[in-house]
Amino acid sequence: KEDMGQFRLSGEVSGMGRIKEIERRASGKRKRKPVVYLICEGSETEIRYFKRFRTRDCNIDIIPIPSQYKSADKLVQKAGATIGYSPYYPDEGDQIWCVFDRDDNTNAMLAKAKQTAIKEGYHIAFSNPCFEIWFLLHFNNQTTAVENCDATIKLLKRKGRLEQYEKNTEVYDQLKPLQKTAIDRAKKRVSALQLEHKEIFTRESNPVTTVAELVEYLNSKSLSYD
């Protein structure tokens, strides 16, 4: 059984974070809004979607960044390097979220990604088989396995859903009215797997997504969200 609640992975601040914290205190910079870095694997789909959470009344800075790494373990391992010299002060509310899919990751790769995230204090938004399963949950309570991303998109494009959907298209406005429904469905699926003592970060957890936790967190930082 998962022992991390709803995947709020915790751990020590990375060496890079400690160095930046010392530099920040020495320079006496004034307080700024916390920054949330979303390290996303390759595709613009996730980048385009999460950019829409950046609103004027949001009290965090949301910065989606594409990663050059396709494997989950490398994406998480190199997350600190991916943000480069950008400010990262976890003690002031900054967070790093690693957003990735099952894709060709083995269970060993997924386990390593989880282990590294815990060690570094990062968070994970994992989707199995792909990010589009999160979109699909806005329209259908999908609890049976979906073979791959193509099959997921085929379900997503059924009549009454996102019939014109293509990778990297803008879908936020169409999904927003159904977002709370998707969150509820995603969380129930995670809970069901946990009750069965099944590991979430495996190929066998299909279908599942922990994107709902990230969406809830981003919404909680918007003053206009109800």
Question: What positions do the PLM features span?
Answer:
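C-terminal accessory helical subdomains adjacent to catalytic cores in phosphodiester-
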Residues: 1-37, 46-47, 51-66, 85-97, ...
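Short, charge-patterned binding micro-sites
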Residues: 68-71
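Helix N-cap/beta->alpha junction signal
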Residues: 41-43
